């Protein structure tokens, strides 16, 4: 699949990488429909010390569920979903108290090596994926962007 990486400060490029796979029972594989460029992406983009090939973070996306892990009960293949920027595991003390942005398992990562790609693996999907009614074709381009 294609994925964006930084090639140098102020420049990104496409590389071919392996399509992500289900690794845990509560994983979901999403086919990315839209993603955006966030301020934190721009920090790396503008960094003069960025290493060529460094993964482009990208952490906001909407997509279609392609595959689900055996523990997934909240979505099914074909569902249109939001993959939120920050999400928790749903199991730790912080998540159970309603503070999933400070999840005990979410230390220095968004559980993704970048969503500016054709597919992504989304962890803890039962807790955090947000199902959207309908399919992308039900929405105008302006609504999707």
List each model region and its residues.
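Extreme N-terminal starter segment of soluble prokaryotic enzymes
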Residues: 1-2
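Short Gly/Pro-enriched turn/cap motifs at secondary-structure boundaries
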Residues: 7, 19-20, 52-58, 108-113, ...
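Well-ordered beta-strand positions in beta-sheet-rich domains
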Residues: 14-16, 42, 119
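NAD(P)H dinucleotide-binding glycine-rich loop of Rossmann-like/cofactor-binding domains
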Residues: 89-145
């Amino acid at each position: 699949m294609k994925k964006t990486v930084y090639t140098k400060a102020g420049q990104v490029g496409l590389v071919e990488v392996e399509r992500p796979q289900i690794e845990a029972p509560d994983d979901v594989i999403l086919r990315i429909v839209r993603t955006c460029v966030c301020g934190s992406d721009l920090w790396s983009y503008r960094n003069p010390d960025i290493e060529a090939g460094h993964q482009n973070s990208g952490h906001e996306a909407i997509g279609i569920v392609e595959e689900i892990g055996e523990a997934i009960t909240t979505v099914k293949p074909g569902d249109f979903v939001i993959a939120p920027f920050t999400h928790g595991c749903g199991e730790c003390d912080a998540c159970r108290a309603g503070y999933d942005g400070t999840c005990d398992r979410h230390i220095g990562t968004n559980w993704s090596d970048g969503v500016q790609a054709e597919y992504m693996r989304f962890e803890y999907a039962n807790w955090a994926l947000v199902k959207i009614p309908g399919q992308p074709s039900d929405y105008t381009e302006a609504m999707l962007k």
